[in-house]
Amino acid sequence: MKQGKTLETLGAELQRQRAARQDFVADTRHLNFYTEDGKSRLTLTTGNKLLEFGVNPLAHQQISARLGIPLKYYQRMQTEAPALLDENVNNWLQQSPERRMLRVMDGNVRAFLSDRYRRLDNLELCAAVLPIIQGMKGAVIESCEVTEAHLYLKVINRKMKAEVAVNDACVII
Protein backbone atom coordinates (compact mmCIF):
# COMPACT_ATOMS: atom_id res chain seq x y z
CA MET A 1 0.00 0.00 0.00
CA LYS A 2 1.26 3.45 -0.83
CA GLN A 3 1.73 5.87 2.02
CA GLY A 4 -1.74 7.19 2.78
CA LYS A 5 -3.32 9.47 5.31
CA THR A 6 -2.42 9.87 8.94
CA LEU A 7 -4.94 8.65 11.48
CA GLU A 8 -5.92 12.27 12.15
CA THR A 9 -6.60 13.09 8.48
CA LEU A 10 -8.46 9.79 8.10
CA GLY A 11 -10.62 10.72 11.10
CA ALA A 12 -11.39 14.13 9.62
CA GLU A 13 -12.35 12.56 6.27
CA LEU A 14 -14.57 9.96 7.95
CA GLN A 15 -16.33 12.72 9.91
CA ARG A 16 -16.87 14.64 6.66
CA GLN A 17 -18.23 11.52 4.98
CA ARG A 18 -20.59 10.84 7.85
CA ALA A 19 -22.07 14.33 7.45
CA ALA A 20 -22.28 14.00 3.64
CA ARG A 21 -23.73 10.49 3.38
CA GLN A 22 -27.37 9.62 2.88
CA ASP A 23 -29.07 6.23 2.79
CA PHE A 24 -32.43 5.74 1.11
CA VAL A 25 -34.56 2.59 1.06
CA ALA A 26 -36.79 2.82 -1.98
CA ASP A 27 -39.11 0.80 -4.17
CA THR A 28 -37.41 0.38 -7.55
CA ARG A 29 -40.61 1.64 -9.22
CA HIS A 30 -39.78 5.07 -7.76
CA LEU A 31 -36.39 5.15 -9.49
CA ASN A 32 -35.63 6.53 -12.93
CA PHE A 33 -32.29 6.05 -14.68
CA TYR A 34 -31.17 8.38 -17.47
CA THR A 35 -28.07 9.67 -19.21
CA GLU A 36 -27.31 13.36 -19.60
CA ASP A 37 -24.16 14.71 -21.24
CA GLY A 38 -22.62 11.23 -21.15
CA LYS A 39 -23.18 10.84 -17.39
CA SER A 40 -25.63 8.44 -15.78
CA ARG A 41 -28.17 9.92 -13.40
CA LEU A 42 -30.66 8.28 -11.07
CA THR A 43 -33.74 10.00 -9.71
CA LEU A 44 -35.76 8.93 -6.70
CA THR A 45 -39.30 10.13 -6.19
CA THR A 46 -40.20 10.38 -2.50
CA GLY A 47 -43.65 11.78 -1.88
CA ASN A 48 -43.63 15.16 -3.59
CA LYS A 49 -39.82 15.40 -3.81
CA LEU A 50 -37.62 14.41 -6.71
CA LEU A 51 -34.04 13.63 -5.65
CA GLU A 52 -31.36 13.38 -8.33
CA PHE A 53 -27.97 11.70 -8.07
CA GLY A 54 -24.96 10.77 -10.15
CA VAL A 55 -23.97 7.10 -10.30
CA ASN A 56 -20.44 5.93 -9.47
CA PRO A 57 -18.71 2.88 -11.05
CA LEU A 58 -19.36 0.50 -8.13
CA ALA A 59 -23.08 1.36 -8.16
CA HIS A 60 -23.13 0.72 -11.93
CA GLN A 61 -21.67 -2.76 -11.31
CA GLN A 62 -24.24 -3.47 -8.61
CA ILE A 63 -27.15 -2.26 -10.78
CA SER A 64 -25.88 -4.41 -13.64
CA ALA A 65 -25.61 -7.49 -11.41
CA ARG A 66 -28.97 -7.00 -9.69
CA LEU A 67 -30.86 -6.48 -12.94
CA GLY A 68 -29.13 -9.42 -14.62
CA ILE A 69 -27.49 -7.32 -17.33
CA PRO A 70 -24.01 -8.69 -18.12
CA LEU A 71 -21.43 -6.08 -17.06
CA LYS A 72 -19.58 -6.02 -20.40
CA TYR A 73 -22.87 -5.39 -22.23
CA TYR A 74 -23.90 -2.79 -19.63
CA GLN A 75 -20.60 -0.95 -20.08
CA ARG A 76 -20.87 -1.14 -23.86
CA MET A 77 -24.35 0.40 -23.71
CA GLN A 78 -22.96 3.13 -21.43
CA THR A 79 -20.48 4.24 -24.08
CA GLU A 80 -22.15 3.27 -27.37
CA ALA A 81 -25.91 3.34 -26.72
CA PRO A 82 -26.79 5.25 -23.53
CA ALA A 83 -30.48 5.55 -24.50
CA LEU A 84 -30.64 1.75 -24.76
CA LEU A 85 -29.02 1.42 -21.33
CA ASP A 86 -31.55 3.86 -19.88
CA GLU A 87 -34.43 1.90 -21.42
CA ASN A 88 -33.07 -1.46 -20.22
CA VAL A 89 -32.40 -0.32 -16.66
CA ASN A 90 -35.76 1.44 -16.33
CA ASN A 91 -37.60 -1.54 -17.79
CA TRP A 92 -36.08 -3.96 -15.27
CA LEU A 93 -36.51 -1.56 -12.36
CA GLN A 94 -40.24 -1.41 -13.19
CA GLN A 95 -40.70 -5.08 -14.15
CA SER A 96 -38.97 -6.47 -11.06
CA PRO A 97 -40.13 -4.22 -8.23
CA GLU A 98 -38.30 -4.58 -4.94
CA ARG A 99 -36.95 -2.46 -2.15
CA ARG A 100 -33.29 -1.46 -2.52
CA MET A 101 -30.99 0.67 -0.42
CA LEU A 102 -29.21 3.51 -2.17
CA ARG A 103 -26.07 4.69 -0.40
CA VAL A 104 -25.36 8.25 -1.48
CA MET A 105 -22.22 10.28 -0.85
CA ASP A 106 -21.61 13.81 -2.10
CA GLY A 107 -24.60 13.62 -4.46
CA ASN A 108 -23.60 10.30 -6.09
CA VAL A 109 -25.07 6.83 -5.63
CA ARG A 110 -22.10 4.82 -4.45
CA ALA A 111 -23.95 1.57 -3.73
CA PHE A 112 -27.15 -0.19 -4.86
CA LEU A 113 -27.83 -2.76 -2.14
CA SER A 114 -30.42 -5.01 -0.56
CA ASP A 115 -32.78 -3.22 1.82
CA ARG A 116 -31.60 -5.73 4.45
CA TYR A 117 -27.99 -4.53 4.19
CA ARG A 118 -26.60 -3.59 7.60
CA ARG A 119 -25.78 0.09 7.62
CA LEU A 120 -22.24 0.32 8.89
CA ASP A 121 -20.03 3.23 8.04
CA ASN A 122 -16.26 3.48 8.13
CA LEU A 123 -16.29 5.69 11.22
CA GLU A 124 -18.18 3.03 13.20
CA LEU A 125 -15.81 0.37 11.89
CA CYS A 126 -12.75 2.37 12.99
CA ALA A 127 -14.32 3.02 16.40
CA ALA A 128 -14.64 -0.75 16.87
CA VAL A 129 -11.27 -1.80 15.43
CA LEU A 130 -8.84 0.91 16.58
CA PRO A 131 -9.08 0.14 20.33
CA ILE A 132 -8.28 -3.50 19.56
CA ILE A 133 -5.26 -2.53 17.45
CA GLN A 134 -4.08 -0.06 20.10
CA GLY A 135 -4.30 -2.84 22.70
CA MET A 136 -1.97 -5.09 20.70
CA LYS A 137 1.60 -4.91 21.97
CA GLY A 138 3.95 -3.70 19.27
CA ALA A 139 1.19 -2.81 16.79
CA VAL A 140 1.62 0.46 14.92
CA ILE A 141 -0.78 1.93 12.38
CA GLU A 142 1.61 2.65 9.55
CA SER A 143 -0.81 4.15 7.05
CA CYS A 144 -4.51 4.50 6.29
CA GLU A 145 -6.61 5.39 3.28
CA VAL A 146 -10.26 5.63 2.36
CA THR A 147 -11.62 5.40 -1.18
CA GLU A 148 -15.15 5.34 -2.59
CA ALA A 149 -15.30 1.60 -2.01
CA HIS A 150 -12.71 0.64 0.63
CA LEU A 151 -11.12 1.57 3.94
CA TYR A 152 -7.48 0.53 4.32
CA LEU A 153 -5.48 0.32 7.54
CA LYS A 154 -1.87 -0.82 7.33
CA VAL A 155 -0.93 -2.22 10.72
CA ILE A 156 2.60 -3.40 11.49
CA ASN A 157 3.14 -5.53 14.56
CA ARG A 158 6.81 -5.02 15.36
CA LYS A 159 6.76 -7.72 18.05
CA MET A 160 5.56 -10.34 15.56
CA LYS A 161 8.09 -9.14 13.01
CA ALA A 162 10.88 -9.75 15.53
CA GLU A 163 9.59 -13.23 16.38
CA VAL A 164 9.10 -14.46 12.80
CA ALA A 165 12.30 -14.75 10.81
CA VAL A 166 12.78 -15.09 7.07
CA ASN A 167 12.18 -18.68 5.85
CA ASP A 168 10.23 -19.61 9.02
CA ALA A 169 7.19 -21.75 8.28
CA CYS A 170 4.01 -19.86 9.15
CA VAL A 171 0.45 -21.15 9.21
CA ILE A 172 -2.50 -18.77 9.04
CA ILE A 173 -5.53 -20.13 10.84
Label every PLM stretch briefly.
Residues R119-I173:
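Intrinsic disorder/low-complexity polar-acidic segments
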Residues M1-A128:
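Feature for intrinsically disordered/low-complexity regulatory segments and propeptides
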